[in-house]
Amino acid sequence: MKKKILAAVLACALSVSLIACGQTDTTEPDGGTADQAATYTVGICQLVQHDALDAATRGFIDALNEALPGQVVFEEKNASGDPANCSTIVNGFVSEGVDLIMANATPALTAAVSATADIPILGTSITAYGVALDIDNFSGTVGGNVSGTSDLADLEAQANMITEWFPEAKNVGLLFCSAEANSRYQVDEVTKYLSAKGITCKEFAFTDTNDVASLAQAAAEFADVVYIPTDNTAASNKEAIANVLLPAGIPMVAGEEGICTDCGVCTLSISYYDLGRTTGEMAAKVLTGEADISTMPIEYTAATPKYDPDVCELLGITPLDGYTPIEK
């Protein structure tokens, strides 16, 4: 009898040890533990930590918790800016059999799409789904197991913003990461609109964080104005960019508020938190069967013209009417 009791105790201890070894970072549902309340497991793959993507993830979680209180466990993973890590993360989600994957930024989305054709995938902070997923004549709906939200602001309006704020500008430097397909798309479109206005555009494309500062310096030496699209690598290195452009007195127009803040003059801003919330609302509909993801169109959010008051003051630029100051 003593031997049986001892064996039972050892088995229990081993079971507890194995459970502890298998833990991952999770956000438990409000109002209970994962074992008690969770109905769904959602894997979140975020490319890199920076303000915009962080806000989108936060909005996603908040909206889904509000829609399905006490029913969702979130597994949050950050790829630390490495697309290869995105593949590792989403393959882990697939092996675990999560109920839905939220892919925050384009490399996370493409990794998820490559990993599964069965688990629903919702993207957020994706600039152009057609470009990211190599879809010809993209009509607004991806189909299959993929949908989501886009952070794309009107690119013609961005080009017009450059000429409205800086009507004397002749040379525009386009600073972006060549490894980000969405950045290439934005740069090509903005170049098309600016060239039609007689403005000379020159690309300054960095491949990774190592050459951001040197390319920013080259852009500053060429340009009257620098344009930076919605670009994750640029957003993660905006301090290095600001340390070059601001002392040189070169104004920058940004594709999104995160890059503009403390670095640029003006932007067409969207709320990444609201973008994430919209994605979370879509997720609730997919998880409960209220909506078929294969027919869900990509959703967008309205942009607000904003300016950075500190940068404008530093560069001696008077803000245009109709622009709201960025709150810090």
Where are these regions (language model features)?
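Sec-dependent N-terminal signal peptides of Gram-positive bacterial secreted proteins and lipoproteins
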Residues: 4-23
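Hinge/cleft segment of the Venus flytrap/periplasmic-binding protein
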Residues: 285-328
